[in-house]
Amino acid sequence: MSRKPETDFIQRLHRKMGAVKPYHMKLNNPLTAGIPDVYYSGSGGELWVEYKYDPKAGFGKKFVLPALSPLQVAWMNGRYKEGRQVAVILGCMQGVMIYTHGKWAVPMAPSFFTQHLVSEQEAADWIKSRTLKDVGIGVTGHEPAAQTD
């Protein structure tokens, strides 16, 4: 049985974290819909991440919005309002978009989306920067401030 592209994407990011990586637990419980795909924790904090993979994101004229269910949006928004670290990480053919601060529900113009993509290595480093202390990486995260188009 072949794996889904999303599963391959998650595993690539985990490999790019190297030997020093946060504890992570893949979550998949059909009885509690809406909970993100992976929970991370380490000396620097906790992070909940919903992963999506859309190879066509950013191509054409269609605005980009992660394909989240209403339950996922509600769960993510609820935890964000509680002050927890939550993110949606969308992989595509051109790179990776990291959505934080509730912006997972805001459509992005394709040109804005592609201008703010990071590499898979940068996404892996971003996760480490949110969950581990003193790991020697200089990643501050990547959050587009405002959409201009």
How would you name each of these model-derived features?
Residues 77-104:
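Nucleic-acid nuclease catalytic cores
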Residues 27, 48-51, 89:
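Short, conserved beta-strand edge motifs with alternating hydrophobic and charged residues
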Residues 1-29:
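Acidic-basic catalytic patches of nuclease active cores, encompassing PD-(D/E)XK
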Residues 98-120:
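Short, electropositive alpha-helical surface patch
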Residues 55-75:
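Mg2+/Mn2+-dependent nuclease catalytic core
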Residues 38-40, 45-57:
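Conserved catalytic cores of phosphodiester-cleaving nucleases, focusing on short active-site segments
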Residues 22-43:
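Active-site metal-binding core of divalent-cation-utilizing nuclease and nuclease-like domains
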